[in-house]
């Protein structure tokens, strides 16, 4: 109660099981308790949402999350780097006080330009994103038909549940 800042941090899509976070619920909770919201959308950027903007778009909470972080090395094909976006005041503070930011190098302009081009492409044409989701659904269906326990999901992450750690390590 007596903290200057409170923050709820969540993945947009959880990498181990492909579950998409309930960001409406998270944002409602944050408003109730006067918290900031930070979403790591590394497994959603380019894949989830009407234009591929991520889980905040898919959950209709754009503008309610205070910080969004993501990577350029999944759907955006940059192979390195990432980004943090948010309200100007928060970004300015991070630029001044975030040690990882202070001691890192800027991304090469070509990587940034390529990622921006991919964002334009996937926001204008859903065919690549549709294909990824179709492939994931096909994989789910075929693995279930072979007797594997495959949970349903709304993301392209498809966990194969073995429930046997030694077997999973083989």
Residue ranges and their predicted role:
Residues 1-39:
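Active-site phosphate-binding strand-loop segment of PLP-dependent enzymes
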Residues 13-17, 44-47, 101-102, 159-160:
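Short, small-residue-enriched loops and turns at beta-alpha junctions
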Residues 130-139, 145-170:
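Conserved PLP-binding catalytic core of the aspartate aminotransferase-like
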Residues 110-130, 141-145, 164:
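Amphipathic alpha-helix from the class-I
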Residues 80-81, 98-107:
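A short glycine-threonine-serine/GTX helix/turn-capping micro-motif
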Residues 6, 104-105, 149-154:
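Short beta-strand
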Residues 51, 57-93:
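Active-site PLP attachment segment
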């Amino acid at each position: 109660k007596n903290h200057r800042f409170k923050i709820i941090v969540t993945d947009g899509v959880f990498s181990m099981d492909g579950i998409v976070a309930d960001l409406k619920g998270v944002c409602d909770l944050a408003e109730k308790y006067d918290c900031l919201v930070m979403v790591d959308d590394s497994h959603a950027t380019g894949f989830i949402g009407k234009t591929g903007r991520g889980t905040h778009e898919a959950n209709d909470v754009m503008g309610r999350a205070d910080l969004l972080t993501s990577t350029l090395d999944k759907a955006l094909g940059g192979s390195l780097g990432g980004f943090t976006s948010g309200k100007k005041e928060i970004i300015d503070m991070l630029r001044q006080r975030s040690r990882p930011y202070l001691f890192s190098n800027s991304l090469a302009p070509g990587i940034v330009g390529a990622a921006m081009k991919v964002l334009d492409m996937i926001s204008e044409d859903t065919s690549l994103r549709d294909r990824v989701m179709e492939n994931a659904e096909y994989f789910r269906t075929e693995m279930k038909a072979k007797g594997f326990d495959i949970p349903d999901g709304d993301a392209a992450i498809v966990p194969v549940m073995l429930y046997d750690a030694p077997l999973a390590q083989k």
